[in-house]
Amino acid sequence: TPVLDGLAAKGVRFTDFHAGAAVCSPSRATLLTGRQNLRTGIYGVLQDHMHDMHLLEREVTIAEVLKKAGYSTAHFGKWHIGMTSGKRKKPSLQDHGFDYWFGLSNGAHPNHRNPTNFMRNGKRVGPMKGYSCQIVVSDAINWLETKANPDQPFFMNIWFNEPHSKLAAPDEITSIYGDLKDEAAIYSATVDNTDRAIGRLVAKLKETGKLDNTLIIYSSDHGSYRADRNGGLKGNKGSNFQGGLRSPG
């Protein structure tokens, strides 16, 4: 991950960084609000078609705070803290302070390659070509280039799907790490591909002269579901041991 390594080398690296919870939805609710997840209305992993729970509209997110301070706000990628599904009506991302959003209620389908379930401001986009992380960054770059006031300060909340299953990555990257059908190699390739996507975004910020005045924060919502990718820590995703809660920062 040369891009992330470069950002860490020029910034601050936290070696004892912890997520808000050991599973996805609660951790994301905590990250956006700074509050214990049960207070936000999120008490477990969310499935919109099955659950009424969602990030409560009364909760104040970082996007709402920054929007009130004059920032342009946007979300890109996985959401997973509540979207309307059928008769289960839930607040929109606009209700939570985002002027614009492009992403998914949960995972990419059928996998990270050529996903079919992305939405833009609540409307389905349809089948897309490419890989989720690159698709998300392309839309983020387009938003930066076309937002109404280029001089307005901005907050971008980018939540990548990779390296969550179901896995998919370009063969030319997977082959660097092993056999094309090896799940561990594909997992590594999704991390590599995400690093390359982040590199494109950093390059755009540099090209537009915004990089030196932009704070970039990179982390994860919990530990890996692969026990062999948790740095020897006890436990993994879903566990309240360090392997479930420690994350990069």
What does each model-found stretch correspond to?
Residues 1-249:
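Formylglycine-dependent sulfatase
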